[in-house]
A protein has these predicted regions:
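Amphipathic alpha-helical hairpins
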Residues: 1-168
Length: 168
């Protein structure tokens, strides 16, 4: 089912489709984060990626709970957006020789993924509330809060040291 196809007729259809989209995205990030951690030079950045990997695994489990709570099939649909973000990160990482610049590029890629997730979770929460599913909205809010916290940590790390090293 593609976005804006005939298969999406109701708010509930849209909600379930976006759940499937973010489920796919989170599962792809579970695969990508170890590679990003391996490429990272800065120890704090490397550890941040590994910590977020653990959180992302919990996000996948939480989404599986949300599917069940909502009575929907646990299913992932391809998400070209997250695939593109991950592909671009891989390509850039392969082109950057300077380790400090690579760390800055990795943060940029991670934040692109975070911002995508933040938008998706924000919409899902609003739609869950409209559908009378405050229980589901509450579960999704936990993940949104964690995604925002990760984004803030990445910004702090970039601004306090990574970007400074990359520029020198």
């Amino acid at each position: 089912m593609g976005l804006f196809t005939k298969d999406i007729k109701t708010m509930n259809d849209l909600f379930v489709h976006q759940l499937q989209d973010i489920y796919y995205a989170e599962k792809q990030l579970v695969k990508a984060l170890p590679k990003m951690a391996e490429k990272a030079n800065d120890k704090q950045l490397k550890q941040g990626f590994l910590t977020h990997l653990d959180e992302t695994k919990i996000h996948v489990q939480r989404l599986e709970q949300v599917f069940q709570m909502h009575g929907a099939e646990v299913k992932a649909v391809n998400c070209p957006a997250i695939d593109g973000i991950i592909k671009e990160a891989d390509e850039v990482a392969g082109e950057v020789d300077d380790k400090s610049v690579l760390d800055a590029a990795l943060i940029n890629a991670a934040q692109a993924a975070e911002h995508y997730e933040i938008v998706r979770y924000g919409s899902l929460i609003a739609w869950a509330k409209q559908l009378g599913r405050n229980d589901v909205a509450s579960m999704l809010q936990k993940t949104l809060d964690e995604e925002k916290a990760t984004d803030k940590k990445l910004t702090t790390l970039a601004e306090s040291r990574i970007n400074l090293r990359a520029a020198s």
